Amino acid sequence: DVYKRQDQESAIFEQNELFLDLTTNYEREGLYKSELKDVLNKARLIEEENSTFLLEQKRKFNDHFSKWQELFRSFLTAEIESDCLLPDGNLQDFIVHLEWIALEYTAIKQFLFLDWMQNGSLTYEKIRDTITLVCRMTGYEEDYIYEYMQDCFDDVVWEWGYLAFILT
């Protein structure tokens, strides 16, 4: 179906843009250079890829990625419990932290997708190293998270459809 295909294509490009945006400052500062070099090069080439090829690659990657669901379920549970359930937090804090975790997850998955496109494998070690790297890159104080969200999005609280869109 044409609309589903367009949504899937748009999601791939949006996920890639989010990944590039999250890594911009690190690249500029020369941080994590060796870890990011190859995937950033691939990320910049995504826009030029044939969409049919990209969709097929994403489908194949998701087949491999699904084997790691339990690991990611545990990771996301730990992130939500530690970042969203704050003693003095309010509903907006909860939502913003949940969105930040979604960005973190999207960046991890996009990094792994780009790496998988280059190397054809998805190993526990690569997943572990990627989670560690992205968590370091996104481990900011609350003030910075709010500032980033405000700068990158119209509002710090997204439409729920956008959250679902980037997580596809």
Model segments located where?
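Short, small-residue-biased leader/transition segments that mark boundaries at the very start
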Residues: V2-Y3
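Substrate-recognition/cap regions that form aromatic- and gly/pro-loop-enriched pockets
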Residues: I12-T168
